[in-house]
Amino acid sequence: MATFKKFNKDKRPKRNTQSLLFKRKRFCRFTVTGVEEIDYKDVDTLRDFIAENGKIIPARLTGTRAIFQRQLNTAIKRARFLALVPYSDQHKI
């Protein structure tokens, strides 16, 4: 009967990934400032929620509440359609 040795992966030193990355407390920027509705013409605010590659940053990363995230998505899509914000990073303004 052949016996096989199990390789113990636990011998490798474990890194604490949470301490390596600085985690700040996420909060909804729109709730704090008292914004009732997000406007598609406010391009500076919209750019804060668009990644470098042109994708919309999810609420779990930005901390935006669900109601404002839906408004934000609609506003970004309207601004893209009207060419106020580029669709991707390949398009320069």
From Swiss-Prot:
This is Small ribosomal subunit protein bS18. Gene3D superfamilies: Ribosomal protein S18. Keywords: Ribonucleoprotein, Ribosomal protein, RNA-binding, rRNA-binding. Part of the 30S ribosomal subunit. Forms a tight heterodimer with protein bS6. Belongs to the bacterial ribosomal protein bS18 family. GO terms for biological process: translation. Pfam families: Ribosomal_S18. Binds as a heterodimer with protein bS6 to the central domain of the 16S rRNA, where it helps stabilize the platform of the 30S subunit. PANTHER family: 30S RIBOSOMAL PROTEIN S18, SMALL RIBOSOMAL SUBUNIT PROTEIN BS18M. Disulfide bonds: none annotated. The gene is rpsR. One of its GO terms (molecular function) is small ribosomal subunit rRNA binding. GO terms for cellular component: cytosolic small ribosomal subunit. It comes from Verminephrobacter eiseniae (strain EF01-2).
